[in-house]
Curated annotation (Swiss-Prot):
Activity is enhanced by dithioerythritol, and is slightly inhibited by fructose 2,6-bisphosphate. AMP does not inhibit the enzyme activity. This is Fructose-1,6-bisphosphate aldolase/phosphatase. GO terms for molecular function: fructose 1,6-bisphosphate 1-phosphatase activity; fructose-bisphosphate aldolase activity; magnesium ion binding. Mg(2+) 4 binds at D241. It comes from Thermococcus kodakarensis (strain ATCC BAA-918 / JCM 12380 / KOD1).
Length: 375
């Protein structure tokens, strides 16, 4: 491989057993996944890999030359999750295999439970990439930070002072209820974009693309987010979606610091305990991504990489392992305390329409026959 060649970066994650409860991943699950992926490097299926964790989610980060949605790569991830699930069951871990919602692999893990973010890119002379991993929240949790990275000049100075970025970017937004998508240009359609993505439980940013004239081809994503909703697959609540994202940085794109800056504000996201509460998103190093207080607060980990000319993953650098984010963590804890004091009341608890796929309807159904008309 060399500069100018195509390479694919795949991040595929699943919750296949918590230790204990929903708090973290047992080390034996990581080792099992590493064994499966090591063999895949030896047989040439993938170029390189890293197995990360965030909360109770096992995260597979892989580079290869097989493109997005490759049955070989998705099948490999499924095998790693299946083998790790066997270990989880032997250990009696909580929710063993809970994100594997189908019995057999059918060529693509989309719609089978795991979350997927992938991009096929043309390698630049230097290719800095950040993978983001969230726990106890939903795909819409990325809306605000991705918007700020690529469309907010108060966050990203490059939008003002870098000629390569000054034209703005294109946002691919998915309506995850109607299964439709729209492409919006910024800054021209900024207000239209915000009208959609502010409703983060329905409209989610799936990809960001450069505009024509940018050094990066306009059909190559510069950011991609997993958008799988577990309840749409299972038909009931089986866990929160815990999204992942891949973001490219530098040289006509947001600088590394501009990619990380949105997370200095611990904005409110949906998820937390039983997937039913709003709470702050706390940026943490990987060793602190173990949600315990009320199964939270929700966490985000940022891993930094350089992709070598051979497609190797040079890293990771645990980017939130930095005292510069201590204030964000402290603020997140203050917000956590404030929100928890609401107990079962909104706005800490999600509104009823967002509780449809939780266990609450089963409770409310018992009261249906006891309601009577008000005269």
């Amino acid at each position: 491989m060399a500069v100018g060649d195509k390479i694919t970066i795949s991040v595929i994650k699943a919750d296949i057993g918590g230790w204990p409860g929903h708090s973290r991943v047992h080390p034996q699950l990581v080792e099992t996944a590493e064994d499966v992926l090591s063999k895949a490097v030896e047989d040439g299926t993938i170029i390189d890999f890293y197995v990360a964790t965030c909360g109770d989610d096992l995260q597979l980060i892989m580079t290869h030359k097989r493109g997005v949605d490759s049955p070989d790569i998705h099948g490999l991830a499924w095998k790693a999750f299946e083998e790790a699930t066997k270990v989880a069951k032997e250990l009696g871990l909580y929710g063993a295999g809970q994100d594997l919602l189908k019995d057999a692999f059918s060529g693509n893990v989309r719609g089978m439970g795991p979350g997927v973010a992938e991009m096929e890119i043309t390698l630049r002379k230097s290719e800095p990439v950040v993978t983001f991993h969230m726990d106890k929240t939903e795909p819409g949790a990325f809306n605000l930070p991705i918007f700020r990275m690529f469309a907010d000049p108060f966050n990203t100075a490059g939008l003002i002072i870098d000629p390569k970025m000054h034209m703005g970017f294109r946002f691919e937004v998915w309506d995850i209820l109607e299964h439709k998508r729209v492409i919006l240009n910024t800054p021209e359609e900024l207000y239209d974009l915000l009208a959609l993505i502010g409703a983060k439980s329905r409209y989610v940013i799936k990809r960001v693309y450069p505009k024509p004239g940018h050094p990066i081809p306009e059909n190559e994503p510069v950011a991609v987010v997993s958008t799988e909703k577990l309840y749409e697959v299972a038909g009931e609540y089986v866990g929160k979606d815990d999204p992942v994202a891949i973001v490219r940085a530098q040289s006509g794109l947001p600088a590394l610091g501009e990619v990380l800056e949105p997370f200095a504000f611990p904005h409110l996201v949906s998820g937390w305990m039983r997937g039913s509460h709003n709470g702050p998103l706390m940026p943490v190093p990987m060793h602190q991504a173990n949600p315990t207080r009320f199964d939270g607060p929700p966490r985000v980990v940022a891993l930094g990489w350089q992709i070598s000319p051979e497609g190797k993953l040079v890293g990771p650098v645990d980017l939130f392992d930095d005292p510069a984010f201590d204030y964000a963590r402290q603020k997140a804890l203050e917000i956590t305390e404030y929100m928890r004091r609401h107990g079962p009341f909104e706005p800490h608890r999600l509104p009823l329409e967002e509780m449809e796929y939780t266990t609450l309807p089963g409770v409310l159904k018992r009261l249906t026959d006891r309601f009577e008309p008000i005269e």
